[in-house]
Amino acid sequence: MAIDFSLSPEQQALQAGARQFAAGVLSQVKATIALHPAHEDRFFATRPFYAQMAQAGFVHALFPKAYGGSGMSIVDFALAAEELCVADINVPSTLLSTGLGMEPIIGYGSEEQKRRWIGEILEAPGDRLAALAFTEVTGGSNYDSPDPSAGVQTFARLEGDEWVINGQKHYTTNGCGWDGKGAHLISVVCRTDPGKPPAESLAVIVVPGSTPGVEVVGYLDTVGHRAVVSPRIHFNNVRVPAGNILGKPGDGIAICQYAFTWTAALIGAACTGVMRAAFDIAFDFAKNDKRSGNVPVIEHQNVGYMLADIKMRIEAARYLTWKACHQLDVTDRRSDELAVMTKVYSSELCVQAVYDAMRLVGVDSYTVLSPLSGLMQDALCFPLYDGGNMGVRRRQLHRKFRAPGYDPMASAEGR
């Protein structure tokens, strides 16, 4: 049977619907957030857009049908995500971050935990956010360090039938919630024993953001993703029931890998969307601007070559994303190599593609009046976040290559 990249009628309808939503709703985000100089206020200003996204069914798409969601495949979610990110990166990132906060529950929660916490989000999908509290103030790349004195320094100790959590996190996307006090649910990556390595002590404990001791202490004002909130959060003697742990101590490494594998593949879709936006701007400029010459600049060979390079990067990123997402769907995420490759490759392609679009347009692209300057600010984030390409993602691939019996053709052949 031939390999077929055609979309089904249902997928075409999903893609068209997401494109229409992006053009009709998300295209207004930039002008709205421009009115707010403070980082957190820009985020709060996107709440109506997120509510419309929830009404359109995108929050339900994060969850399996068995727990009230629509059960959308990762491939289908990627199709929609690409379209959304052509128009705006901010509100789709808030959606993706709610997914990241809930992925530990989806993958490792008990039946009771899944029904309870997914149900809570879906009771008010436009109002309730989830977050993953992963990154320590000192960094997150060494979260799995075998040295107990290094890595995660947020600790949970068991006192009777409660976990008592103390520590500090930052870059906790969505962590402040819409009220600035805490997301509805925060999946906290912590250790249960300071004397044991992560393989024995790393855990994920679900903390309602309204729990006493959860404190939003500040916001990191990022260069790009201007309305994606990145708060610092302190956990000061936060008490939650012992039953709020997902799995058992020591499962934290697997849980984090499960969650970040999902986002790794989908970041490829976000990067593809941003590259498309940059290409559209450069293409329109090339067709219509003569730069004081006699013909539109697209008639010049070098301009055509640059457009070709950008378009090739878009196509390569899209199809690697599709394959990675398909492989996650059919293997229940047991095969994650392509997802990690997608995150690294697409994010670095995106930076180069946007830069080439800026080079094509010239110095005018470097002003704040040009949308390309904003797209570059957004693109620069992709290689650095969600497991930085150097600190985490390439290390994941290196670890795979070093493993006994590694088969370099396994991911290519869907094994």
Explain the meaning of each model-derived region.
Residues M1-S93, R116, E120, R402-R415:
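Amphipathic, small/basic residue-rich leader segments at the start of a protein or domain
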Residues I3-A16, E215-E315, S411-R415:
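Glycine-rich beta->alpha junctions and the first turn(s) of the following alpha-helix
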Residues I3-D4, A80, V361-R415:
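Glycine-rich phosphate/cofactor-binding loops in nucleotide/flavin-utilizing enzymes
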Residues K30-E40, F283-V295, K311-Y345, M358-Y366:
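C-terminal helix-coil-helix/basic helical segment that borders enzyme active sites and/or dimer interfaces
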Residues P92-E112, G140-S141:
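N-terminal glycine-rich flavin-associated loop
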Residues G126-G139:
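A short, Trp-centered hydrophobic/proline-enriched beta-strand micro-motif
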Residues G140, H170-G177, H225, W262-I267, ...:
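Glycine-rich phosphate/pyrophosphate-binding beta-alpha loops
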Residues D161-E162, N166-V214:
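A short core secondary-structure module
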